C-alpha cells in the first residue's frame, strides 16, 4: 500500500523536524515549508494527501492558514497545529475547513491519531481542548 503524502508548514524548523520524526514511519513527508509563498506553491501542486500547518504561519493577505488552504484546494484535508486552546480558535479553524486541530504541546501524543482520523474522513481535536 502506498504511504500517504504529507506536507508540513511551520515557520519553526525545529517543530517541522519534530513533526517529521513523528510521522516518518507511517507516512511520506514529501515537503516541509516555512512561509506563505512556499505553502501556496505546494498546495497548488496537488501532490499531497494531507497538510499539517501551524496556525501562525504569516499570511500576507490577512487570511488565516485554514482559510488560505481551503481557498487554494477545497478538497485537501488538513490538520492545524496551534499553541492556542481557546474554543474560539478551535471553532474558527474548523469553520474554515480544518479537519483536525492539535495543540503543539500535545503533538507527540495527538498528531498521529489526528492524521489517521482526518485521512479516514473524520474530524479530530486534541482531547485536552474539547469542550
Kindly give the residue locations of the regions a language model identified.
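Short, flexible helix-to-coil linker/hinge segments that flank and couple to helix-turn-helix
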Residues: 88-95, 99-131
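Short amphipathic alpha-helix used as the core "switch/output" element in two-component signaling
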Residues: 63-75
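Active-site residues of response regulator receiver
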Residues: 54-55, 82
Amino acid at each position: 500500500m502506498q504511504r500517504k503524502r504529507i506536507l508540513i508548514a511551520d515557520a519553526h524548523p525545529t517543530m517541522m523536524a519534530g513533526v517529521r520524526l513523528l510521522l516518518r514511519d507511517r507516512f511520506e513527508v514529501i515537503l516541509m515549508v516555512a512561509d506563505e509563498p512556499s505553502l501556496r506553491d505546494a498546495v497548488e501542486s496537488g501532490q499531497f494527501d494531507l497538510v499539517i500547518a501551524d496556525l501562525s504561519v504569516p499570511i500576507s493577505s490577512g487570511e488565516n492558514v485554514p482559510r488560505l488552504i481551503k481557498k487554494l484546494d477545497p478538497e485537501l484535508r488538513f490538520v492545524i497545529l496551534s499553541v492556542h486552546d481557546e474554543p474560539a480558535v478551535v471553532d474558527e479553524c474548523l469553520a474554515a475547513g480544518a479537519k483536525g486541530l492539535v495543540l503543539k504541546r500535545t503533538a507527540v501524543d495527538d498528531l498521529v491519531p489526528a492524521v489517521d482520523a482526518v485521512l479516514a474522513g473524520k474530524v479530530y481535536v486534541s482531547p485536552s481542548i474539547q469542550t
